[in-house]
Amino acid sequence: MDKKASRIRRATRARRKIAELGATRLVVHRTPRHVYAQVISANGSEVIAAASTVEKAIREQVKNTGNVDAAKAVGKAVAERALEKGVASVAFDRSGFQYHGRVAALAESAREAGLKF
């Protein structure tokens, strides 16, 4: 099993558990160049809020779109957008990525901006 298949397996297991809880989830995805975050409804059919370093507003705030500072900006933006829509509590879905570096920075930034998880 290669590295990507292992990550997807971990992500599937976590998503199954979150679905059992019936919680709205904050999903994180990262590539070497960008960081993406979405708040998805409990049934998985609706994206409530989203933010990424691909967006012009966030891209202009940071020098590099693939680092910890960019992840912090994305976390803050997605939390603010979720709170505007009335979502204050989420389950954190790290998509099988290790809770370290950019993933952890995004989570901490979202917590500081007011999301609870």
Curated annotation (Swiss-Prot):
Gene Ontology biological-process entries: translation
Gene Ontology, cellular component aspect: cytosolic large ribosomal subunit
Checking Gene3D superfamilies in the record gives: 3.30.420.100
Q: List keywords of the entry alphabetically.
A: Ribonucleoprotein, Ribosomal protein, RNA-binding, rRNA-binding
Example GO molecular function term?
A: 5S rRNA binding
Q: Which InterPro entries match?
A: Ribosomal_uL18_bac-type, Ribosomal_uL18_bac/euk
Query: Which residue ranges run through the membrane?
Result: none
A Pfam family matched in the record: Ribosomal_L18p
Q: How does it assemble?
A: Part of the 50S ribosomal subunit; part of the 5S rRNA/L5/L18/L25 subcomplex. Contacts the 5S and 23S rRNAs.
Entry's family note: Belongs to the universal ribosomal protein uL18 family.
Task: Kindly provide the name given to this protein in its UniProt entry.
Answer: Large ribosomal subunit protein uL18
Q: What organism does this protein naturally occur in?
A: Vibrio atlanticus (strain LGP32)
Its taxonomic path starts at: Bacteria, Pseudomonadati, Pseudomonadota, Gammaproteobacteria, Vibrionales
